[in-house]
UniProtKB/Swiss-Prot annotation:
Pfam families: UPF0122. This is UPF0122 protein SAG0983. It comes from the Bacteria. Gene3D superfamilies: Winged helix-like DNA-binding domain superfamily/Winged helix DNA-binding domain. SUPFAM superfamilies: Sigma3 and sigma4 domains of RNA polymerase sigma factors (SSF88659). Belongs to the UPF0122 family. NCBIfam families: PRK00118.1-1, PRK00118.1-4, YlxM. Might take part in the signal recognition particle (SRP) pathway. This is inferred from the conservation of its genetic proximity to ftsY/ffh. May be a regulatory protein.
Length: 110
């Protein structure tokens, strides 16, 4: 499994997990976050390997569709870069540093 795809799916999952069914969440988490094989997930879930594969592929498309419509992940990346640029440029501005820290903590809430 390629690392870029794994990282992207994990990131999209963090943003959109609440919009998935329990089964979709479970399969994606086991496959991408916990590095289970399709066979291991199938055995644990009592379904065929093909059923797991189909569910994961369908869920990947769903996550990508959410991102295409909502842009939560891409906006987060842009926002983080802007915060980093501001923090780097204005290292002596305590007020600005504090406000950026507050905004960053909002982005990182669970």
């Amino acid at each position: 499994m390629e690392i870029e795809k794994t990282n992207r799916m994990n990131a999209l999952f963090e943003f959109y997990a609440a919009l998935l069914t329990d089964k979709q969440m479970n399969y994606i988490e086991l496959y991408y976050a916990d590095d289970y094989s399709l066979a291991e997930i199938a055995e644990e879930s009592g379904v065929s390997r093909q059923a797991v594969y189909d569910n994961i592929k369908r869920t990947e498309k769903i996550l990508e569709a959410y991102e295409m419509k909502l842009h939560m992940y891409s906006d987060y990346i842009v926002r983080s870069q802007i915060f980093d640029d501001i923090l780097e440029k204005y290292t002596d501005d305590a007020f600005l540093q504090e406000k950026i820290s507050i905004l960053s903590s909002i982005d990182n809430r669970d």
